[in-house]
């Protein structure tokens, strides 16, 4: 099980992205930075609010760190729990990785999509090719290796029980967080996530330029 509790410390900028935190602060370098603008999917990781909800694939390069405080984050570094996840094994078997830079993002997107509780419904090995195309629509392979990646997706779907079991991720906490007040960090830039309308109004009044 891949689970760790991290505190967002004073060295973490208030405007840091999830990707910056994962690679620099947490040392989890499996998640890659490709475009830094949310277009290529190389930085895809999975986020969920609690263990009773399905993971959602997000682009870590454009996700503010403050937005995922208290959420579980699963990266490619912990996907296999000591071995290869079925999606990773299938990518190897079907030669779905060429230069390899985009591979972690594709793996994470497919792992999330194989979840039977996914909001868009379950995909299986008999799902049509277009459904699988949509599953990786947010990921770009510059080597144009889409056919073997799609083959790997369908192969992974055959390992139903294993492919649909995702481990727990790391939980990101914050220094300034309580049940009564929203999350707030300060530096040259700031981040504030109010938990009530009153908090929002107070923050807006204090920073009308925001």
Give the ranges of each region predicted by the language model.
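Short, intrinsically disordered, charge-balanced linker/junction segments flanking boundaries
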Residues: 207-210
């Amino acid at each position: 099980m891949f689970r760790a509790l991290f505190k967002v410390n004073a060295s973490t900028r208030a405007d840091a992205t999830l990707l910056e935190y994962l690679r620099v602060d947490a040392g989890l370098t499996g998640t890659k930075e490709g475009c830094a603008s949310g277009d290529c999917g190389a930085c895809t990781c999975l986020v969920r609010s609690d263990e009773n909800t399905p993971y959602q694939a997000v682009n870590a390069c454009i996700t503010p760190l403050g937005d995922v405080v208290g959420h579980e984050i699963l990266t490619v570094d912990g996907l296999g729990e000591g071995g290869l996840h079925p999606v990773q094994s299938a990518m190897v078997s079907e030669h779905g990785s060429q230069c390899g830079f985009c591979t972690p993002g594709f793996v994470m997107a497919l792992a999330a999509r194989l979840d039977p509780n996914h909001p868009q419904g379950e995909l299986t090995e008999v799902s049509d090719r277009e459904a699988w195309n949509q599953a990786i629509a947010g990921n770009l392979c510059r080597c144009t290796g889409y056919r073997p990646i799609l083959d790997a997706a369908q192969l992974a779907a055959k390992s139903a029980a294993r492919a649909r079991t995702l481990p727990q991720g790391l939980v990101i906490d914050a220094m300034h967080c309580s049940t009564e007040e929203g999350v707030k960090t300060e530096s040259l830039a700031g981040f504030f996530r109010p938990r009530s309308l009153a908090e929002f109004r107070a923050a807006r009044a204090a920073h009308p330029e925001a």
